[in-house]
């Protein structure tokens, strides 16, 4: 099995090295990742300048682009052999609920949707590395068992691992995405020359985080697995829209 590994924290981030170490004994792994932190890049592509891959001493490929650029380039010409699946992470920080709309970690996995295997996005619910071994364990466990998984084509599995030692994790739960409340207001700053600027503030707290959600699972000490689909069509709105459009003609 051949796996393309990517992330959004950057090619030198500890999480991607941990993911490679977790999977390299079970698969032929190649790493293509951004040359700097691209958290929050979502599915953006770089279109205004060329991309320049650079192979590092450890064999990883660094790219001056986004997480989606990395996977897109890997699947469309940079790699001589097409991988079987894309695995993204291990992100240091949660990708729960609405986070998936902004996450470069999830976006990198989504870009691997055309491959025959399901794509995985792994996130440790912490900015610290103490419990990276826990995330490594579950990444190895889930990816190595993917061939027994029967899911529709183009399924992306968003996996969040609680910030706990392995012996304190209570198990794995299948979940839906929760929802966050509105984010905090951007923080206004003024530089010494009087020019105003803004820092994006923290994401909102869980507004819909009850039982069955990814938020609830990790808070209770479980690994959360949420299957994501790419059809963003809001089918339940069709009836109201049909009636509305009928009144316009």
From Swiss-Prot:
Please give the Gene Ontology molecular function terms for this protein.
3'-nucleotidase activity; 5'-nucleotidase activity; exopolyphosphatase activity; metal ion binding; nucleotide binding
For this record, an example GO cellular component is: cytoplasm
The reaction(s) annotated as catalysed by this protein in its Swiss-Prot or TrEMBL entry are:
a ribonucleoside 5'-phosphate + H2O = a ribonucleoside + phosphate
Q: Where, by residue number, does a divalent metal cation bind?
A: 8-9, 39, 91
Q: State its role.
A: Nucleotidase that shows phosphatase activity on nucleoside 5'-monophosphates.
Alphabetized, the UniProt keywords read: Cytoplasm, Hydrolase, Metal-binding, Nucleotide-binding
E.C. number: 3.1.3.5
The protein's enzyme class: hydrolase
**Stated name of the protein:** 5'-nucleotidase SurE
Instruction: Name any cofactors this protein relies on.
Output: a divalent metal cation
Q: What protein family is recorded?
A: Belongs to the SurE nucleotidase family.
Cofactor: binding details? Binds 1 divalent metal cation per subunit.
Metal-binding found in the keyword field: yes
Where does it reside? Cytoplasm
Give the chief site where it resides. cytoplasm
Q: Which InterPro entries match?
A: SurE, SurE-like_Pase/nucleotidase, SurE-like_sf
